A protein has these predicted regions:
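Conserved beta-loop-beta element that borders a ligand/cofactor-binding pocket
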Residues: 1-10
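Substrate-positioning beta->alpha
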Residues: 14-20, 33-56, 63-64
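A short C-terminal helix-loop "cap" of Rossmann-like NAD(P)-dependent dehydrogenase/epimerase domains
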Residues: 20-33, 89-92, 125
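Glycine/small-residue-rich pyrophosphate-binding loop that anchors the diphosphate of NDP-sugar donors
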Residues: 39, 116-119
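Residue-level signal for the nucleotide or nucleotide-sugar donor/cofactor binding architecture
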Residues: 43, 71-74, 122, 135-138
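Mid/C-terminal beta-alpha module of Rossmann-like enzyme folds, strongest
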Residues: 54-113, 124, 129-130, 146, ...
């Protein structure tokens, strides 16, 4: 099974986790790699399960690989905006070249240069040939609300990564336009 980026209410899809949402709530800018327009497929865990469970033990799946992803592929700008909207604020985005992020933080950069900086859109036709009723129905906007609501339910879940927070301050200062 090839799920790509599957998430649940506990997973903020930005390095530093809750840090990006907390920054937005504080009126601070957040870093989005590149120009923010690369497409990224985020799949809600419940949608993944709808594709995965019917494949279990199915004779046509033995020894074969299947993508199980959403058909929705928002841009990274849209992902940030959905989280901001769910948090009741506006996203203030500063675009930073992926290479610059990688130079400043090799761990963050590895996930960008090897993956997230490139558009990722998947074809689920093979999955649908075995599970024709598969449809991902949970858009990231709904998932973003679940993420924010879950974190808001218990303040101990709102963990800010001080290293990523400071790095974002540094990158924002360097790459802010205007």
């Amino acid at each position: 099974m090839r799920p790509s980026h599957t998430y649940d209410r506990t997973l903020v899809p930005f390095d530093g986790g809750w840090t990006a949402v907390e920054r937005m709530r504080q009126g601070k800018e957040i870093v989005v790699h590149g120009d923010g327009t690369s497409l990224w497929t985020l799949t809600h865990h419940a949608d993944f399960a709808k594709g995965f469970v019917p494949l279990l033990g199915h004779p046509r799946t033995i020894g074969d690989a299947f993508h199980i992803t959403s058909d929705d592929a928002p841009t990274w700008n849209q992902i940030a905006e959905a989280l901001a909207f769910a948090a009741g604020v506006e996203a203030r985005i500063v675009h930073v070249p992926s290479d610059a992020i990688a130079a400043a933080d090799p761990d963050w950069g590895a996930g960008l240069l090897g993956d997230k900086a490139h558009s990722m859109v998947f074809d689920n036709s093979k999955l649908r040939s075995v599970v024709p009723e598969f449809t991902a129905t949970i858009p990231f906007e709904q998932g973003a609300r679940e993420i924010v609501d879950w974190h808001d339910e218990d303040p101990t879940r709102k963990r800010v990564d001080p290293r990523i927070d400071a790095l974002m301050d540094q990158l924002v200062e360097t790459y802010r336009v205007g």
